Amino acid sequence: MEKDMFGVSRLKVNLHMHTTLSDGSKTPEEAAETYKKAGYDVVAITDHWIYRDSGEIGGLRILSGAEYNIGGGDASTGVYHILGIGCSKKPNLTQEAGPQKIIDEVHRCSGIAILAHPAWSLNTAQQAAALNGVDATEIFNSVSDEGESSRPYSGDFVDTAACQGLFYPLVADDDTHMYNGCDDTKAWIMLEAKITDSDEALLQAIKEEKFYATQGPEIHIRRNGDEITVLCSPVSRISFFSNAVWAPERGHRGTGLIKAVCHVQPWEKFIRAEVTDEQGRKAWSKVIRL
């Protein structure tokens, strides 16, 4: 557990990882050790179609989870990977289930449904609009940049979905498979919570967007009327994104930047922010609806 720049306690959390129980290269015990050593407080082990209950491994807290993937490898026919996190019991699902059935069953079991790596899956805003109850989506997925498609970043999906009125909490996850230093301990969320909080409280904090997604930097976004402010750890770039294809004050570059401000334009529907540090590591804010 760490405290942010405002003294708020936060947990370092990864919500997407695989083990030898499906297609990962480490056992659950080895995977937990890797993340424990990297300072993580909570992880969800999300093997494909293999539900793992909540608990603890080697002192690392485990949220229940599984990844339900459907559609094979051809995005033209629809590919959906949905994480079921924090379920109180095993969802009653078969691999014939469609994406909406998966979401509904995860909710029936008191979990949250996260749309995984939409850029990697080539998911569209139209596909997302057909799904009811998606609780969050990944804006970054580490393994998707490692030899499969090089589509780790889902910002374009997030923005086009927001243009259609679809707003999601944005998480960053590893989706660890190889554990080779490229896809492990590279992206996470910093969740406003305490390690003594219940699973239900952690899930509620995620749904209420009480976190930021990051590869290292800290980021906070605030709105005061038509003024949007980002406060962050020292970075070299602060960028604002919205439905406006062009607007002033959206790109800020420099050394040791810790703050940037932009003003909302009358036609804007949403604004979010990203920061990039000197090492190229990014952090992503929540989406502010206007």
Predicted regions and their residues:
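A metal-dependent hydrolase metal-coordination microenvironment
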Residues: 1-112, 116, 122-126, 130-133, ...
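Short loop/turn and capping residues at structural boundaries
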Residues: 46, 117, 172, 216-217
